[in-house]
């Protein structure tokens, strides 16, 4: 029998502890090792047993979750999934948690609404199981993502066809500008920071989908903008894709790459979950295959699941140059692995070599 994933739940809310316990125990691969109402009780339990994953509340009496997380990561690193409310102030706190080493985040609004069979409950279980496989050596450098825990079940999984306009069949002229499309999930927030910090101010125009809920992407883009030479912002419908500028897909919206003549711009739309996500990497990549073809470069980074795999294959088939982050540098080698398995990847590189590859490719345009 396979070893179960043992979870320690730390939250000052009895109802959250009870709901999380109920939701997680519906999965036969998960068992609750213990629950604790604050970090001090959790510390005592950690002296007795070590879990595979910890779920950690952000706001608690006596010691907040971020302080406990930092102490834990400096003394005994364990995969941690943060639990937080969906607020703009909370988004800043959660970015600090990801910097401190949290693997992932789930929203309390989804926990409170979840029953054992709901889509939200499925997502919570998926996040915890994924965290148990995280490479902690990479988590400290490329720490996590933020997840809304809002996905469809496998039977309802939709493809990017629901968002893409019909293909025009028109020939695509080569332009002198290159556009870079990036997709990431678990581990992506810090992986993207490391990647973007290495790019100069005249880097190619770039569009990015990082799996995040609404209200978090604006804070994420603002944080990156303060760290990088390129200009980074949350995308707005109709924004042009310009050299030296990076557009981040807004949470809970899909982002498509569009083209008018030699000009690229983004279309930001509402719509159903695609590949179990909104925003979806597949939506961006498949739109890039149609609108940019060989003028594009596709990059798929650390993350669980298969979002982006089909889109990267279509980019590859349309003549784009495609790169996947390697397993050794990924926090979770899911999305890159699926893209490689589909045959849509031209080159596999460690994270610290991807920015250089972008600049080398740019010289060919």
UniProtKB/Swiss-Prot annotation:
Catalytic positions are 185, 211, 307
Q: Which domain of life is it from?
A: Bacteria
Q: Name one GO molecular function term.
A: protein-glutamine glutaminase activity
UniProt-listed InterPro entries: CheB-like (IPR008248), CheB_C (IPR035909), CheY-like_superfamily (IPR011006), Sig_transdc_resp-reg_Me-estase (IPR000673), Sig_transdc_resp-reg_receiver (IPR001789)
Task: Report domain Response regulatory positions.
Answer: 6-123
* PTM entry text: Phosphorylated by CheA. Phosphorylation of the N-terminal regulatory domain activates the methylesterase activity.
Q: Cite the EC number.
A: 3.1.1.61, 3.5.1.44
The record's keywords, sorted A to Z, are: Chemotaxis, Cytoplasm, Hydrolase, Phosphoprotein
Q: Which Gene Ontology BP terms does the record give?
A: chemotaxis
Give all residue intervals belonging to the CheB-type methylesterase domain.
173-359
UniProt-recorded name of the protein: Protein-glutamate methylesterase/protein-glutamine glutaminase 2
| Phylogenetic placement of the source organism | Bacteria, Pseudomonadati, Pseudomonadota, Alphaproteobacteria, Hyphomicrobiales
Gene it is expressed from: cheB2
């Amino acid at each position: 029998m396979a070893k179960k994933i043992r979870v320690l739940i730390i939250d000052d809310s009895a109802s959250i502890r009870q709901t999380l316990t109920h939701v997680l125990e519906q999965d036969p691969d998960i068992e609750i090792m213990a629950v604790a109402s604050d970090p001090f009780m959790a510390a005592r339990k950690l002296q007795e047993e070590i879990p595979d994953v910890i779920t950690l509340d952000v706001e608690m009496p006596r010691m907040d979750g971020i302080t406990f997380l930092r102490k834990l990561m400096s003394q005994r690193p364990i995969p941690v999934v943060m639990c937080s409310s969906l607020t703009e102030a909370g988004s800043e706190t959660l970015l600090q948690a990801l910097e401190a080493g949290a693997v992932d985040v789930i929203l309390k609004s989804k926990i409170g609404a979840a029953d054992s069979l709901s889509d939200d409950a499925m997502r919570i279980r998926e996040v915890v199981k994924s965290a148990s496989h995280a490479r902690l050596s990479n988590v400290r450098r490329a720490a996590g993502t933020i997840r809304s825990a809002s996905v469809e079940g496998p039977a309802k999984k939709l493809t990017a066809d629901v968002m893409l306009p019909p293909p025009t069949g028109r020939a695509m002229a080569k332009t002198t500008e290159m556009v870079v499309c990036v997709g990431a999930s678990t581990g992506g927030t810090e992986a993207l920071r490391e990647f973007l910090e290495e790019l100069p101010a005249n880097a190619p125009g770039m569009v990015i989908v990082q799996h995040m809920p609404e209200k978090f992407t604006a804070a994420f883009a603002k944080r990156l903008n303060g760290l990088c030479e390129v200009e980074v912002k949350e995308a707005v419908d109709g924004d042009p894709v310009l050299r030296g500028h990076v557009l981040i897909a807004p949470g809970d919206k899909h982002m498509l790459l569009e083209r008018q003549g030699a000009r690229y711009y983004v279309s930001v739309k509402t719509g159903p979950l695609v590949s179990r996500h909104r925003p979806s990497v597949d939506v961006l990549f498949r739109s890039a295959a149609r609108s940019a073809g060989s003028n594009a470069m596709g990059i798929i980074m650390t993350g669980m699941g298969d979002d982006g795999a089909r889109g990267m294959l279509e980019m590859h088939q349309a003549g784009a140059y495609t790169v996947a982050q390697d397993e050794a540098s990924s926090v979770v080698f899911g999305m890159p692995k699926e893209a490689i398995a589909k045959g849509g990847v031209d080159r596999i590189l460690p994270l610290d070599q991807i920015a250089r590859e972008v600049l080398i490719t740019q010289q060919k345009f």
